Amino acid sequence: MDSPFKPDVVRGQVALITGGGSGIGFEISSQFGKHGASIAIMGRRKQVLDDAVSALRSLGIQAIGLEGDVRKQEDARRVVEATFQHFGKLDILVNAAAGNFLAAAEDLSPNGFRTVLDIDAVGTFNMCHAALKYLKKGAPGRDSSSGGGSIINISATLHYTASWYQIHVSAAKAAVDATTRNLALEWGTDYDIRVNGIAPGPIGGTPGMSKLVPEEIENKTREYMPLYKVGEKWDIAMAALYLSCDSGKYVSGLTMVVDGGLWLSKPRHLPKEAVKQLSRAVEKRSRAKPVGLPTSKL
């Protein structure tokens, strides 16, 4: 699908994307690169990184892969420093690394709960903390007239209500959203850094979708989604581009929901025509009923 953005909207910028070697993270890496940015992707699996970098470079995108675990502060610092040393600056940080699996709360070990919190919530803060020195206004490599950089945290909508078998992810993403809002307040005020989030819904062709949503459940989910379809990785990448380029220059502290309206939706228990018939019947009975005298003793 063609992009609605001009091909140079992030030209000359440098973006570091955690989890950028696969799924949504790779699509964001690819679209940022196609729109002019230089790309550093971070991940734990060397082969995935190598394949992703090769794919990006085949498109004419300047890209490097950096091994690291977002849970480790030393890895976060090392990857940020390596990005700066290679490209000379850092403009955009996208925290897309995430952990997820299904487990009933009673079957989920404290270690399993902690692991997802560490990847999603602690990992997001580790990367933000390490990147601050290069994202803030007036940082090395930054034009003083251009202001600060931009951070995008990939979240979810699971914690907006409650979700079956994902208490660990719900807790982690709630923490990510709180981090987004608080950093937008503090770092926007002190360092001119914009901080936003994106909460994807079901996105086809991703490891998370294949792991968490079997085909039978996906088909059932479509029945009560307002748009009757799952999203594409492209949808999330376009949201990330909007938040990173000048089109989103006055947006900060927002977690943008990109889920086709799914989290707002509920199964339709009555067809629309049945509702009309029921309403007419109720109205008819109401008019036929004698008004009578008030029966209250008050």
Curated annotation (Swiss-Prot):
<dbReference type="GO" id="GO:0000325">
    <property type="term" value="C:plant-type vacuole"/>
</dbReference>
<feature type="binding site">
    <location>
        <begin position="109"/>
        <end position="111"/>
    </location>
    <ligand>
        <name>substrate</name>
    </ligand>
</feature>
<comment type="function">
    <text>Auxiliary enzyme of beta-oxidation. Participates in the degradation of unsaturated fatty enoyl-CoA esters having double bonds in both even- and odd-numbered positions in peroxisome. Catalyzes the NADP-dependent reduction of 2,4-dienoyl-CoA to yield trans-3-enoyl-CoA.</text>
</comment>
<feature type="short sequence motif" description="Microbody targeting signal">
    <location>
        <begin position="296"/>
        <end position="298"/>
    </location>
</feature>
<feature type="binding site">
    <location>
        <position position="101"/>
    </location>
    <ligand>
        <name>substrate</name>
    </ligand>
</feature>
<protein>
    <recommendedName>
        <fullName>Peroxisomal 2,4-dienoyl-CoA reductase [(3E)-enoyl-CoA-producing]</fullName>
        <ecNumber>1.3.1.124</ecNumber>
    </recommendedName>
</protein>
<feature type="binding site">
    <location>
        <position position="44"/>
    </location>
    <ligand>
        <name>substrate</name>
    </ligand>
</feature>
<keyword id="KW-0576">Peroxisome</keyword>
<dbReference type="InterPro" id="IPR002347">
    <property type="entry name" value="SDR_fam"/>
</dbReference>
<feature type="binding site">
    <location>
        <begin position="200"/>
        <end position="206"/>
    </location>
    <ligand>
        <name>NADP(+)</name>
    </ligand>
</feature>
<comment type="similarity">
    <text>Belongs to the short-chain dehydrogenases/reductases (SDR) family. 2,4-dienoyl-CoA reductase subfamily.</text>
</comment>
<feature type="binding site">
    <location>
        <position position="173"/>
    </location>
    <ligand>
        <name>NADP(+)</name>
    </ligand>
</feature>
<keyword id="KW-0521">NADP</keyword>
<feature type="binding site">
    <location>
        <position position="71"/>
    </location>
    <ligand>
        <name>substrate</name>
    </ligand>
</feature>
<dbReference type="GO" id="GO:0008670">
    <property type="term" value="F:2,4-dienoyl-CoA reductase (NADPH) activity"/>
</dbReference>
<dbReference type="InterPro" id="IPR036291">
    <property type="entry name" value="NAD(P)-bd_dom_sf"/>
</dbReference>
<feature type="binding site">
    <location>
        <position position="69"/>
    </location>
    <ligand>
        <name>NADP(+)</name>
    </ligand>
</feature>
<keyword id="KW-0443">Lipid metabolism</keyword>
<dbReference type="Pfam" id="PF13561">
    <property type="entry name" value="adh_short_C2"/>
</dbReference>
<feature type="region of interest" description="Disordered">
    <location>
        <begin position="279"/>
        <end position="298"/>
    </location>
</feature>
<keyword id="KW-0560">Oxidoreductase</keyword>
<dbReference type="GO" id="GO:0005777">
    <property type="term" value="C:peroxisome"/>
</dbReference>
<dbReference type="GO" id="GO:0009062">
    <property type="term" value="P:fatty acid catabolic process"/>
</dbReference>
<feature type="binding site">
    <location>
        <begin position="19"/>
        <end position="24"/>
    </location>
    <ligand>
        <name>NADP(+)</name>
    </ligand>
</feature>
<keyword id="KW-0276">Fatty acid metabolism</keyword>
<dbReference type="InterPro" id="IPR045017">
    <property type="entry name" value="DECR2-like"/>
</dbReference>
